[in-house]
């Protein structure tokens, strides 16, 4: 009997092409599954999932596959969104997409796959998995502009055992071409960007609904003079340049640190200012796809779009954290962000960055 693959369909072109490829090129029975993680709609309907679900219906109809919907709104709020708010209120810059992958897409969704009798879960992530003969390892996607292994570095290894990433070896251009050729209803749909529960709204206007504004000083760290005011230190992240609204300087201003107790945002002038660069950090909440003891040197990404940085991993007596020492200074290392570790194409694992918020 042919095995069953459940496709996580978002209503976008990527997951639509995944369903199409599995339906037309494999013997699997294909089922579509739409996951709803957010209930609230703002007055403009910017966070509405209705249009996405309609697109899933249209593509499933084109492919003649059954489809279902599941709501994890309650669990998402508890496991992802509540933590997002807690971390931001403390001054950290969390990555909810990494947490969503670990807690929702590759945990709760996996349980739903089993309920539907599925043998595999397929998603539209631009990642690859090594063959079973080599052991199950997460690899970068072939298209460096779309590689999403960074967002899966916190996902438990066992959660990937039955996962398929059909797009991992393709470029986005190729995926679009397949959608056009197949005349899929989502072929022309634009990619979604940003944090899913914020939608197209300005980040600040969304966050202030949940974390109260508290005005404070913006201080030039070098002169220790007050140069401006802010509405909440939690709105600012290390390395940020936009939104400071500070004039009177030939050099651009960058956020270099925060004092959450005193509600102060510190800035420096010039992108080459030494306080913007650090050579070490601590990584906590670690997740490994390989034995961590075997890792001494590797490369790391300290944010999604950053370049790989060569580094040394210094293990401690605490299994829950490691010290990371970079070969060269790295700009704007941000507490709360995700760090992903690599050995060439292989993702070794990841963790959460812990560094001082105050300049030093």
Curated annotation (Swiss-Prot):
User: Where does it live in the cell?
Assistant: Cytoplasm
Q: Where is this region: Interaction with target base in tRNA?
A: 95-97
A single GO molecular function term of this UniProt record: tRNA binding
- Supply the InterPro entries for this chain: MnmA-like (IPR004506), MnmA-like_C (IPR046885), MnmA-like_central (IPR046884), MnmA-like_central_sf (IPR023382), Rossmann-like_a/b/a_fold (IPR014729)
State the GO CC annotations: cytoplasm
Record-annotated active site: 100, 196
Give an example GO biological process.
tRNA wobble position uridine thiolation
Q: Where is this site: Interaction with tRNA?
A: 125, 337
Asked if the record carries the keyword Mitochondrion, the reply is no
Main location group = cytoplasm
Record's keyword terms, sorted: ATP-binding, Cytoplasm, Disulfide bond, Nucleotide-binding, RNA-binding, Transferase, tRNA processing, tRNA-binding
* Gene3D superfamilies listed in its UniProt record: Adenine nucleotide alpha hydrolases-like domains, HUPs, Translation factors
Say yes or no: keyword Metal-binding present: no
> EC top class, in one word?
transferase
Region of interest: Interaction with tRNA: 146-148, 303-304
Q: Which PANTHER family match?
A: MITOCHONDRIAL TRNA-SPECIFIC 2-THIOURIDYLASE 1, TRNA 5-METHYLAMINOMETHYL-2-THIOURIDYLATE -METHYLTRANSFERASE
Q: Which NCBIfam families match?
A: PRK00143.1, trmU
- The name on file for this protein is tRNA-specific 2-thiouridylase MnmA
């Amino acid at each position: 009997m042919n095995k069953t693959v459940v496709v996580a369909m978002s209503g976008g072109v990527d997951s639509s092409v995944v369903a199409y490829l599995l339906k037309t090129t494999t013997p699997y029975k294909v089922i579509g599954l739409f996951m709803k993680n957010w209930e609230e709609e703002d007055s403009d309907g910017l966070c509405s999932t209705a249009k996405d679900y309609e697109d899933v219906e249209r593509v499933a109809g084109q492919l003649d596959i059954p489809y279902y919907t599941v709501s994890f709104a309650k669990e998402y709020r508890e496991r992802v969104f509540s933590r997002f708010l807690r971390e931001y209120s403390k001054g950290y810059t969390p990555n909810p997409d990494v947490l969503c992958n670990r807690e929702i897409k590759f945990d709760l969704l996996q349980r739903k796959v089993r309920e539907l009798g599925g043998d595999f879960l397929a998603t539209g992530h631009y990642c690859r998995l090594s063959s079973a003969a080599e052991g199950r390892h997460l690899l970068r996607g072939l298209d460096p502009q779309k590689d999403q292994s960074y967002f899966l570095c916190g996902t438990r290894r066992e959660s990937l055992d039955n996962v398929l990433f059909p797009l991992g070896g393709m470029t986005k251009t190729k995926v679009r071409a397949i959608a056009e050729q197949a005349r899929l209803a989502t072929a022309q749909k634009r990619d979604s960007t940003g944090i899913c529960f914020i939608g197209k709204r300005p980040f600040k206007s969304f966050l202030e609904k949940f974390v109260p504004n508290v005005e404070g000083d913006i201080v030039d760290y070098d002169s220790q003079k007050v140069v401006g005011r802010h509405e909440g230190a939690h709105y600012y992240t290390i390395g940020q340049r936009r939104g400071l609204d500070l004039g009177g300087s030939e050099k651009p201003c960058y956020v270099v640190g925060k004092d959450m107790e005193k509600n102060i945002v510190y800035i420096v002038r010039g992108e080459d200012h030494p306080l913007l660069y650090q050579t070490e950090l601590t990584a906590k909440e670690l997740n490994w796809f390989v034995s961590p003891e075997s890792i001494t040197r590797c490369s790391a990404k300290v944010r999604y779009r950053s370049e790989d940085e060569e580094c040394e991993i210094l293990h401690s007596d605490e299994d829950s954290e490691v010290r990371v020492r970079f070969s060269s200074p790295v700009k704007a290392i941000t507490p709360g962000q995700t760090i992903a570790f690599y050995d060439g194409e292989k993702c070794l694992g990841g963790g959460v960055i812990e560094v001082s918020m105050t300049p030093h």
